[in-house]
Regions:
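Short, flexible helix-loop junctions that flank or precede catalytic/ligand sites
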Residues: 1-356
Length: 356
């Protein structure tokens, strides 16, 4: 039997070696080889952990409360901190009666938007005193890291009270000019929606909500933005128009018109991002779609004309907006990605063909 200290040593060694290989995710499954995701591609790591009982190791990573949750049939999410201070996001789950885990390796430092190659106009949006800013994209597209870059920029520049509500906490901030309180779902709070409502009583200037998963959280986030706070959050959507539609569709039919009006009154911007392999698969570059809350865009949202948002963004490039296809075209022209890769990630192949 491995004790807690030995479990820590095993996992820390695994993570340290994975970082050397530029691994972003480690997939561990009882009875199978370990798999790595490197620059978006999966590869087997046949020699890794083969001398250990995977069930024992993964159960040993959890505390008593987490093990109880797992034994009750629920997935378990938590942060794992190695002895050198690096944090990882861990998800442990069951598949075919076997235990499995995915470990997401986080950056050891909080990068800037410039380092991430994300449009720095996002900094300008974060200067707004109130409203809502959304960062969207598929799993693994770097949404949490983009938000961390924005929060850290605020921290260095403004005297604000920032409350983050996360599941789990990924990046830990050191208070500089801002006072930052970080709350973790399942540890400090029960859920996003109730934590948001509580945050309104805690004198915040900025509230970061890890994810807007349901109507209760969406409603609380919009209320926070309406009442004079800047709210940052994420959704698992792949474009600005789809993001607006997802928010509306997540609400009961009788509330959708009101939510549409609230969103039109508070939205400051949406950035959608995905990571595309480049350099022969040795690295990845972000492709983004960027929408700002212009009067024209907000009118389309208010009137339920979300199908016209993409066309409006294409004609509003001078104001800093761009669609995903516009950015894919730029990345191709600059030699970052191939036409083949661009076609894999576009949400409208016919439109992209017009650009190239």
């Amino acid at each position: 039997m491995l004790d807690r200290r030995q479990i820590h040593t095993v996992i820390d060694t695994l993570i340290r070696e994975a970082r050397i290989r530029s691994v972003s995710d480690i997939h561990i499954t009882e009875g199978m080889h370990v798999w790595y995701r490197i620059h978006g591609c999966l590869t087997q790591a046949r020699e890794v952990l083969k001398e250990y009982d995977i069930r024992e190791v993964l159960l040993g990573m959890m505390n008593e409360k987490q093990r109880k949750q797992f034994e009750d049939g629920q997935d378990v999410d938590f942060a794992w901190q190695t002895t050198d201070g690096c944090r990882q996001r861990v998800n442990i789950f069951c598949e075919q009666k076997k235990i499995a885990a995915t470990i997401r390796l986080l950056n050891q430092h909080i990068p800037t938007l410039e380092e991430l190659k994300i449009p720095t106009t996002l900094y300008q949006l974060s200067e707004e005193p109130r409203g809502i800013i959304l960062v969207t994209g598929p799993t693994g597209s770097g949404k949490s890291t983009t938000l961390a870059a924005v929060i850290e920029a605020m921290n260095q520049k403004y005297d604000r009270h920032i409350i983050t509500i996360e599941d789990p906490i990924e990046y830990v901030y050191e208070c500089k000019k801002s006072l930052i309180h970080q709350r973790e779902v399942g540890q400090d709070v029960t859920d996003f929606a109730s934590a948001l409502r509580s945050a309104l009583r805690e004198d915040p200037d900025v509230i970061l909500v890890g994810e807007m998963r349901d109507y209760e959280t969406i409603s609380a986030a919009l209320l926070a933005a309406e009442t004079g706070h800047l709210v940052l959050s994420t959704l698992h959507t792949t474009g600005a128009a789809q993001t607006v539609e997802r928010i509306i569709d997540a609400c009961p039919a009788e509330s959708q018109n009101q939510v549409r009006i609230q969103l039109a009154g508070t939205l400051k911007g949406i950035i959608s991002q995905c990571l595309i392999p480049c350099g022969g698969g040795m690295t990845r570059v972000p492709a983004t779609e960027f929408l700002t809350g212009s009067d024209a865009i907000l009118n389309l949202i208010r009137e339920g004309k979300t199908h016209q948002i993409s066309a409006m963004m294409q004609s509003s490039a001078a104001s800093g907006m761009h669609t995903l296809n516009m950015d894919l075209s730029r990345l191709m022209q600059q030699g970052y990605i191939t036409r083949e890769e661009a076609m894999k990630f576009t949400n409208n192949k016919a439109e992209l063909t017009q650009y190239i």
